[in-house]
Amino acid sequence: MALSWLQRVELALFAAAFLCGAVAAAAMTRTQGSFSGRCPLYGVATLNGSSLALSRPSAPSLCYFVAGASGLLALYCLLLLLFWIYSSCIEDSHRGAIGLRIALAISAIAVFLVLVSACILRFGTRSLCNSIISLNTTISCSEAQKIPWTPPGTALQFYSNLHNAETSSWVNLVLWCVVLVLQVVQWKSEATPYRPLERGDPEWSSETDALVGSRLSHS
């Protein structure tokens, strides 16, 4: 059975969500790796001579959550894409009511996780940048990437990576919201399927009586 146009749009959105999730997870992992495993989100920077240092990082689990949530959702999108491609080519591509309800629940959870991750990235990056700018060594976080950090090699392109992760997360949130809306539309359309009138239905009897009555009146 061929995929419906709603399912095709949904698969295209899943492909885009996979890319966004993969970019966010990779950018967050690179950022944490550049700080030797410490999480810079909501961190506090200090001056160490002429260089910067991350004196008070956040708990590593905070960055693990952002990278893990983005990575798991990207993996889910990839597996779902492969499953639907296989189903459309080999088996029946129709999704039952139970499968649609499960997909709705997963999409709702995904919207929540991506929203939380995007907010953590937004406010965590802003807190770190405010800490850096308050030292009066630079006027922006992007310029702070050019300043040496202690230990050497720390914070390589940290702001660019955090910005990419945040942007990808917000785009991912929009994609998941659209996916959720499409799935709700499919669920409602399958919940009230079209059924032609049959003998014995109240509507059939009323329409038949009206037609017979009008013919008798004309005769």
Curated annotation (Swiss-Prot):
Region listing for Disordered, in residue ranges: 198-219
Superkingdom of the organism of origin: Eukaryota
InterPro entries: TMEM179B
Transmembrane segments: 9-29, 65-85, 96-116, 167-187
Residue positions where Phosphoserine is found in the record: 206, 214
Keywords associated with the record: Membrane, Phosphoprotein, Transmembrane, Transmembrane helix
Family affiliation: Belongs to the TMEM179 family.
PANTHER family: TRANSMEMBRANE PROTEIN 179B (PTHR31056:SF1)
Official protein name in the record: Transmembrane protein 179B
Taxonomic lineage: Eukaryota, Metazoa, Chordata, Craniata, Vertebrata
